[in-house]
Amino acid sequence: EHAITALEHLRAFASPLGVKLLVENLQGDVATPAHLLEILNVGHLDSIGVCLDVGHANLADGVPAAIAELKDRIRSTHLHDNKGDRDAHLWPGDGTIQWDDAMQELRGAPQTPAGVLEIHYTLGETGDSVAEKAKRAFEKF
């Protein structure tokens, strides 16, 4: 109930400014895909979309399950990998996420979501090395 009220207030403030609100899935009970959809549906918050955090989905019920459940509401994605044990924010391909399968599922979404690489900085990386890794990551998609 508190989440619905908070989102209603945010929507009322954001809408006149042309700002689109998104909620993000998290690992844990509070923001699972099922719970996010329940909040959005019960609150009739049809204008609020979802930012699918692929790494968080990998730590919960899995990426394919999250995409299947949220597919109609996904407007953006946070793209990072992990090994299923912690929110490591690794480069895509450096963890256990099956990216080919995930991207195939996302291609079936009604809208093509924006993709944001959400990667932890590694000490000593240069702008050039980060750009090269980002290029390789987006080639997967």
Where are these regions (language model features)?
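Alpha-helical packing segments of well-folded alpha/beta enzyme cores
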Residues: A3-A6, L10, A102, A134-F141
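Gly/Pro-rich active-site loop or hairpin
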Residues: P33-N41, H56-T112, H120-E132
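Structural preference for beta-strand elements that scaffold enzyme active sites
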Residues: G18-L22, S47-C51, I74-H78, D85, ...
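Active-site acidic/histidine proton-transfer and metal-coordination neighborhood
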Residues: E1-G49, L59
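Short glycine-centered, acidic/aromatic-flanked micro-motifs in structured strand/loop junctions
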Residues: V23-N25, V54, I119-Y121
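Structural recognition of alpha->loop->beta junctions
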Residues: N41-G49, L70-R73, A134-F141
